[in-house]
A protein has these predicted regions:
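Amphipathic helical "hinge" segments at domain boundaries
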Residues: 1-49, 146
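Bacterial carbohydrate/catabolite-sensing allosteric modules
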Residues: 24-33, 79-87, 91-217
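Distinct, well-ordered alpha-helical segments
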Residues: 47-55, 201
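Short beta->alpha connector loops
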Residues: 43-45, 66-71, 191
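Structural motif corresponding to alpha-helix initiation and N-cap regions
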Residues: 47-49, 71-72, 165, 169
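Residues at alpha-helix caps and immediate loop-helix transition turns in enzyme cores, especially N-
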Residues: 14-17, 47, 74, 133-137, ...
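Intrinsically disordered, low-complexity polar regions and short flexible loop motifs
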Residues: 63
């Protein structure tokens, strides 16, 4: 079984969510007498080359993509070759197998939770908009604000090209310089949340933070 990672940087391995997924896949594969191969590369071209070798060289029986994004040429390749694969995340095609949850509802529920606690200046810090998970959680966030008659403010939404603590810290600085009265922060990733919390602690701000995908206690 081939695993396709979103990138080959340390960022992937820093995120506690992905190693936990890898452990689960490896355990089930081992129980069923399958081996795991990982397709990585520092950029899209290298990953496409790695997948091509797996597919055309018949090195694996199927692929699992550990991410989902728009117009992915890697997914396009395996789709055209009718090679078995599934995506961990969302797809717009009804013909693609996937494992996912309702991220629109998750974003809505997270935002509504804070609204019911009396918060009205809620910020959203997510990953790149190329990722479906970011798009969907943002949609849920916006739907909750609209349903409760709260204004949408683009200055309270931020999007990171990498899931790093530094990004969460940087965006928090920008956020609180813009609106010191921000009363809640939602992040789509635990590493971003750690950066937010670091900023809040340094500046002795008592603002609640809610994150997704955290596997750390």
């Amino acid at each position: 079984i081939g695993l396709v990672l979103p990138d080959d940087s340390d960022v992937f391995y820093q995120n506690p969510f992905f190693p936990s997924v890898l452990r689960g896949i490896a355990q089930v594969a081992s129980e069923n007498h399958y081996a795991i191969q990982i397709a990585t590369g520092k950029d899209e071209k290298e990953r496409l080359n790695a997948i091509s070798q797996m597919v055309y060289g018949k090195r694996v029986d199927g692929l699992i993509f550990l991410y989902a994004q728009e117009n992915d040429p890697l997914v396009k390749l395996v789709t055209e070759e009718q090679f078995p694969f599934l995506i961990l995340g969302k797809s717009l095609s009804p013909f693609i197998s996937l494992v996912d949850n309702d991220n629109i509802q998750a974003g809505f529920d997270a935002t509504e939770y804070f609204i019911k606690k009396g918060c009205s200046r809620i910020a959203f810090i997510g990953g790149t908009k190329k990722l479906y998970v970011t798009q969907d959680r943002l949609t849920g966030y916006e739907q909750a604000l609209q349903e409760h008659k709260l204004s949408l403010d683009s200055h309270r939404t931020f999007f990171a090209d990498e899931f790093l603590e530094e990004k969460g810290y940087k965006f928090s600085k920008q956020l609180f310089e813009y609106d010191p009265k921000t009363d809640a922060v939602i992040t789509t990733d635990s590493l971003l949340a750690e950066g937010v919390c670091n900023y809040l602690n340094e500046h002795q701000l008592n603002v609640p933070v809610l994150s997704f995908d955290s596997v750390n206690p």
